[in-house]
């Protein structure tokens, strides 16, 4: 299990992981690593939250929120934000399904993708600032948001088909079973409940689950399935929805 965790950490983040820690693990077995997603999210959110706490006393709430969001993006290499931008460029192009998928593979940033990035990043900064001004625990909120968003991404993998012939998302989409999905969601719920007691965290997770489930169904209808880009979009939007639900 530890080897699987390190493999997933190096796969979905840019955090330095010695290769020997995940050596010998077959790429086709990576789908089993879905259960580690909430734990990886917990780690990323905790680091981002620590950045906020350290900087808040020095430069104030808005700048602390800005840098915490920046650090979170850097730790993932902008991987999920790129998926969000590509998904919006494709889906909002109002073209045929095949053309949408082609647009999503285009490395160039379009208008819809750019607007989505601006909206999501700015919204995260504003919501974090508002939560801090209301006295909410930012470290716990960010850790829970990142854990839940990665956990609920399993809803776009279970019983969904991959919309392309090949790609990184094919490792997970349609490859995880009901037990893995339940374990992943269960771990995310435990983290949310422990970090944000009083049902606050669990309630926010329920809202996030509903939002991501609806997103998955809409993308399935539009694209005929899911891709790695739509998983990234779900994670980014999941973080934002969870934080909004805490207000």
From Swiss-Prot:
Enzyme Commission no: 2.7.8.26
Q: Where in the cell is it found?
A: Cell inner membrane
- InterPro entries found in the cross-reference section: CobS
Q: What class of enzyme is it?
A: transferase
Pathway it belongs to? Cofactor biosynthesis; adenosylcobalamin biosynthesis; adenosylcobalamin from cob(II)yrinate a,c-diamide: step 7/7
Keywords attached to this entry: Cell inner membrane, Cell membrane, Cobalamin biosynthesis, Magnesium, Membrane, Transferase, Transmembrane, Transmembrane helix
Membrane topology term reads: Multi-pass membrane protein
Q: Where are the transmembrane segments?
A: 34-54, 59-79, 113-133, 138-158, 194-214
Q: According to its UniProt entry, what is the function of this protein?
A: Joins adenosylcobinamide-GDP and alpha-ribazole to generate adenosylcobalamin (Ado-cobalamin). Also synthesizes adenosylcobalamin 5'-phosphate from adenosylcobinamide-GDP and alpha-ribazole 5'-phosphate.
- The protein's name: Adenosylcobinamide-GDP ribazoletransferase
Organism of origin is Escherichia coli O139:H28 (strain E24377A / ETEC)
In the record, what lineage is assigned to the organism producing the protein? Bacteria, Pseudomonadati, Pseudomonadota, Gammaproteobacteria, Enterobacterales
The gene for this chain is: cobS
């Amino acid at each position: 299990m530890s080897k699987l965790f390190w493999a997933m950490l190096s796969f979905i983040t840019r955090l330095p992981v010695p290769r020997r820690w995940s050596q010998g693990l077959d790429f086709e077995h990576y789908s089993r690593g879905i259960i580690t997603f909430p734990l990886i999210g917990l780690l990323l959110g905790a680091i981002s939250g620590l950045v906020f706490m350290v900087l808040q006393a020095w430069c104030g709430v808005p700048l602390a929120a800005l840098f915490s969001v920046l650090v979170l993006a850097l730790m993932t290499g902008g991987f999920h934000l790129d998926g969000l931008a590509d998904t919006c460029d494709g889906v909002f192009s109002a073209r045929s399904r095949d053309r949408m998928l082609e647009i999503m593979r285009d490395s160039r940033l379009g208008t819809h993708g750019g607007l989505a990035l601006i909206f999501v990043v700015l919204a995260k900064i504003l919501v974090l600032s508002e939560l801090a001004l209301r006295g909410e625990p930012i470290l716990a909120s960010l850790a829970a948001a990142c854990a839940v968003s990665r956990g609920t991404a399993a809803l776009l993998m279970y019983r969904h088909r991959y919309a392309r012939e090949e790609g990184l998302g094919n490792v997970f989409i349609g490859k995880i079973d009901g037990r893995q999905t339940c374990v992943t969601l269960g771990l995310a719920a435990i983290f949310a409940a422990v970090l944000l007691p009083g049902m606050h965290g669990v309630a926010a997770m329920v809202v996030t689950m509903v939002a991501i489930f609806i997103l998955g169904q809409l993308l399935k209808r539009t694209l005929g399935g899911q891709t790695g880009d739509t998983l990234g979009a779900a994670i980014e939007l999941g973080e934002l929805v969870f934080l909004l639900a805490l207000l």
